[in-house]
Amino acid sequence: MKKVIVEKQDLRHPKWSHGRNSSGTAGTFLKSQGSVNGEKIYYKLSYFDSEKGIIGHECANEIIVDRLSGILGVEHLEYQLIHADIEIDDKVYDTWICASKDFKTRGDTKTTLDNFYQVNRLGNESHYEFCNENGWRKYIDTMLAVDYLILNRDRHGANIEVLRNSKKRSIRIAPLFDHGLSFLCSCYTEEELDKFDILMDRPCQNFIGSRSTYDKLKLIENKSDIFAGKLRVQDEEILFRDLDGV
């Protein structure tokens, strides 16, 4: 699958609805869905302001994290970045949108980890302890490390999903997804970009651990065995390929 489609597509037909915005900002994140060759496709926009239009860069962040996860050998939902004309409230916007396939397989139903925890916890175990008891420690440790690397601001309990399949009698965690609110997502001007300290620890909404992505690393016992792959200097070209002008 080609990660970035630069040639502009006509995607004015999808109807956009409000997605969950837990970042504390006044704007919104719009989502939609469609079908390509009979396969369901999910679309989402970057940060949208009703007066200023689409001013965020969350969709570009998704592609960068997608590529980073692939290099590191992390199971994740794959995204495609598409240059497109879209229509919101009878107004056409020239923008970039993210597209992804459904990570559920036939017979799967999904619930948030937050809900799964509330229904199935046995006592006062922490979110991290609960995941460990269910055999998901490696997954969670990997997620914590990824969130630290990208400064993910929004790993709430609905951004981690549990998949059930009654026919297969299986319960598993969904691949990592939804990484738009990361990197420099809070910067909308050149001045804000210049002032942003990439080494500063910032408060984030986390379902597991504290509000600090750095402090959460203390939960990981074997930090040297987190990733199957290794990030190299030359991988910069892969991470940012075809993103000039986005």
Model-found features: residue ranges?
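ATP-dependent phospho-/nucleotidyl transfer catalytic cores
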Residues: 90-144, 206-211, 219-222, 234
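Short, low-complexity, polar/charged sequence segments that are solvent-exposed and flexible
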Residues: 62-64, 117-122, 193-197
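Short secondary-structure boundary segments
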Residues: 16-51, 113-135, 224-240
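Conserved ATP-binding subdomain of kinase catalytic cores across diverse folds
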Residues: 1-111
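Generic recognition of cysteine residues
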Residues: 59, 98, 131, 185-187, ...
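Conserved kinase catalytic-core segment
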Residues: 124-183, 188
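C-terminal catalytic region of ATP-dependent kinase domains
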Residues: 165-246
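Short, residue-level hotspots on alpha-helical faces of the histone-fold
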Residues: 67, 71, 147, 201-202
